[in-house]
UniProtKB/Swiss-Prot annotation:
Transmembrane spans: 50-70
Positions bearing carbohydrate: N116, N314, N389, N473
Stated family: Belongs to the FAM234 family.
Region (Disordered) residue spans: 1-40
Protein name listed in UniProt: Protein FAM234A
Extracellular-side positions: 71-552
Ranges annotated as biased composition (Basic and acidic residues): 1-22
Ranges per topology, Cytoplasmic: 1-49
Membrane topology type: Single-pass type II membrane protein
Keyword annotations of the record: Glycoprotein, Membrane, Phosphoprotein, Signal-anchor, Transmembrane, Transmembrane helix
Location of the protein in the cell: Membrane
Organism: Homo sapiens (Human)
InterPro entries attached to this UniProt entry: FAM234 (IPR045232), FAM234A_B_beta-prop (IPR055409), Quinoprotein_ADH-like_sf (IPR011047)
Entry-annotated residues carrying Phosphoserine: S21
Amino acid sequence: MLDHKDLEAEIHPLKNEERKSQENLGNPSKNEDNVKSAPPQSRLSRCRAAAFFLSLFLCLFVVFVVSFVIPCPDRPASQRMWRIDYSAAVIYDFLAVDDINGDRIQDVLFLYKNTNSSNNFSRSCVDEGFSSPCTFAAAVSGANGSTLWERPVAQDVALVECAVPQPRGSEAPSACILVGRPSSFIAVNLFTGETLWNHSSSFSGNASILSPLLQVPDVDGDGAPDLLVLTQEREEVSGHLYSGSTGHQIGLRGSLGVDGESGFLLHVTRTGAHYILFPCASSLCGCSVKGLYEKVTGSGGPFKSDPHWESMLNATTRRMLSHSSGAVRYLMHVPGNAGADVLLVGSEAFVLLDGQELTPRWTPKAAHVLRKPIFGRYKPDTLAVAVENGTGTDRQILFLDLGTGAVLCSLALPSLPGGPLSASLPTADHRSAFFFWGLHELGSTSETETGEARHSLYMFHPTLPRVLLELANVSTHIVAFDAVLFEPSRHAAYILLTGPADSEAPGLVSVIKHKVRDLVPSSRVVRLGEGGPDSDQAIRDRFSRLRYQSEA
């Protein structure tokens, strides 16, 4: 049993605590001993608190300095719209973008022919040894359209390729290569316009220069990809190999042994062999880069051949099995699981070929394909191809799944002959926004009957499959068009090059930029079939909220 003291402590615990505290007060020596024997926890706590507040003060001080004392770099103000005009000029079907002045906004490069340059630059055709008029290359700011550099580059230009890498340590990390007429071959610094090298070309005066300019792996060991120019003379295609860093010819001219057309594609098989693919009538022709290199240099090189491909190529005609209905018009690379596949577009149908076996993966039926397809994403993170099937008032836009060839969507979009190519931009929802040109009044043929050429630019997004947004309409002749992401997630715009349809009749040439989002509020909503419950303004709001992103 509990004694009297324990029982009282259990019944009255507070009194017991008071008694203990009074005992401690009455015995100070014992209390001091307890303090001396206790660990210095209170002093450690005070040190921790001081360190915490000191760290907090330092963090706040750094935030204050970064936010208010150190000035932030000025972000250039990007105009919503700008326009540059050249009188008595001719514009080329060439358009390229790159950040030339380092302001993190894409700038625009183009070519035009004129007697003199713009008022800001005094270099004339005569200064560069050309007769007037001659071809000028120009780079303008994507932010405001101001001229960054401009100079005469050739009497006339047959072929141009920009963003060609240069060797490490060179004065320019990237160059524009121009093949001129009658016999010039020049490289200019992409960022300043200054000449890197300039030579006379070795092409015959009767030779036609075929597109595009191909970049092949470095064979002369200078650290830059080398250049392959293909020409056609007397129904025979020949290859000319040049150093990418100096422009000097490597070896002699080499014949591919077959007739061909523009639209060449440099393809790498899954064994690492390089082949040149090109359309020849209704067949697909090919040539080994290894064999061409041995012809032009007389010696072996760093390239190799693929035995399977050599067995598919006819030794005499260099033709492969025809997979096309009608003339082959375009060859395009498509990303595959184990390398690139080849999309072969014919005038009456198209087919996706396996990149190694060249066997059809799928073959949808299409009646009349005359335009180059574009790629984009109809479903999230799933690559699709948009094909223009038919022309004029019968044109349809087909969206096909690149994995299966299944038709995802079909849009009836009548167009005018000779309309600009389509374009696409990736959006933040892992799809793409598509831009197509068509008739201003989709349900009327009066424009084609009266000859009133009025192109309208339509915007389409897969989340609204029964709606088109008419952004703008243009009555002048459009030479080139592209949709460009000038700043990541901020600034999507389209670029137009307009000018005379006849290159022999100079006239007004214009370079125009319009920001897409600023055109949406005044756009016209076009409903295809029965529209949904959303109002026109609600649809415009959805297009305005689209965010764009760079390609992965």
